[in-house]
Amino acid sequence: MCIRDSIVADERFTWFFDTFNDQRSAYFMEVNPNALRTDGLITTGQGQSINLNWDGIWDAKAEITDIGWMTEVKIPFRTFNFDPESDTWGVNFMRVIRRKSETVLWTGYQRNQGIERPQDGGLLTGLNGMSQGLGLEVVPFGILTGSEQNLTNGKDTDSDIDGGLDINYSITPSLKASLTFNTDFAEAEVDQRIVNLTRFAVQFPEQRDFFLEGSNIYQFAPASGVNPYFSRRIGLNEGQPIPITYGARLLGNTGPYNLALLHVRTGELGEISPENFSVARVKRNIGSESTVGVVYTRRATEGSGNVEDFTLQDRHTFGTDLELGTSTFLGDKNLQFQAFFVFHNAQFEESTTDFWDRSSRGFRLNYPNDPWAAHVSYREFGNAYNPAVGFAPRNAFRRLQPSFEYSPQFPGSDIIQQIDWELRFEHLMDLDFELLTQEVRLTLFDITFMSGDVISFDVARNYERLEFPFDIRRDNSIILPVDEYRTWTASGEIRTASYRKVSMGAEIETGGFWSGTQTQYGFDVSLRPLPGLELNPEYIRTYVDLAEGNFSTDLFRFEANIDFTNSLFFTTNIQFDNLSNLLGTNNRLRWIITPGSDLYLVYNHNWLEDEQFDRFRTLNRSGAIKVSYTHRF
């Protein structure tokens, strides 16, 4: 995602193009009165979403007048995949008037509809003479980097001049092949830091452009958390980049099929061996709103041989998922059903795990409507389920999760727009049907006012059976013993409307936590004193009082965005937490020279708090200048 994708708090004009008119996916675009742009990919089904990390090549101008504002948009046909034999696209338009908390849609304005649903759009007809030219796109780039790292025996400095090449070719207007050589992601955003007091790994979102395109096809059983393919397994190791030697990709549609094929080779880095990654994803459209799909991944590590007397072998993962949906249930209601099954081979030849140990399966029935909504899901993960190119923070469980929600609107009120009440239940067992986790969470109220302000309050009862000792700070200072823990918590949140020049949010959660109590509060502010300037400080503090010991955590984040023009942006990101004692800053200047051709200036600096001398000392710093040029034939 680039800085231009941050206009959600502004008045804006929004539209989508469903270029295959299949009512399953679409290109999402919007522009505000300052000609700042947002674009992304809409994916329907359970867990439907708008992925704003996709960046297309297009341009927009805007002008504010005495009677309002107007915009002019230029979008090359080459930016889209489409069917040249069809003269009809799906389309919808929306205007967001923030000062009135008002949203106006061209069509799809009923309560169970919206701009994020291509099946609720209208039709754009009479499209003729559309062409992608030769369909060849060449994107060379050059990069100058420099870095400095402070070591115990001195400083290690490095500098380099390098380059790479991306080639895209449209085999058909709806099917595109891509090659990338010596790929670099210096301009990618840094991950948002969190303080993780849970037992499980956190799934950070993908930020790299090459892996973002086609993400709507790669999605597998969304909302079920199965993740047989997770692109951050490729070219990253614990957040640190591993060089990508080359990659090849095929994306698009052919008839009723959606295809996504990927192969990437990563290079050697320290003790990390070169690897080859392959991914294949195929989905077939069924009827007007349903799909069935398969996924396959392979991970092959070169020269690994034996690992602690075990023989590492190529790791293969296979999966299938089914999505059934209708928007005409009982006349005008939405109803969705999802099912999936995934399995993989053993990591080592000597493994004694069986097929069911290395598999996951589940289903989900969803009734996402307004004012009544409900869902129930069930899933099982084997005790050795861990796909090599996927993400599985937890295995060896059976989980049942139902929820019920009632969200009435109040059209006759001048104060309240909507109130939401929700009941969620989680019942998680081990594979022997012994209870591990049980949570009942009740939203007593979640009120959206006509002003756009929101206030909510939840209560929850939780049961946890800890099977193994838990090092909660990950430094061996506080170890939670094997036991059963029962707690109650309460949480509340207040958030003001984002269209204001000063908007803010505050939240607090307090109650039982393992063997003691926890109180967490957070506060964030969004300041927009001038057009094109946005400042976002955020602070989260957590007090933990346990029978085994006490501690507190502090997390500070600050982001500043400056839009000099609709083609020149600067962002700075500062983060600190007192568990790692790391202070880091990421600074990026992006100049869109012409749509598709960019100049990036990037500077990163990380400090470690030295408690002995009560100061921060530099751990490392780095800078990069990267320029890319897109030429279309």
Model-based region annotation:
Residues F16, K74-P76, N92, F141, ...:
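Residue-level recognition of well-ordered beta-strand positions that form the cores
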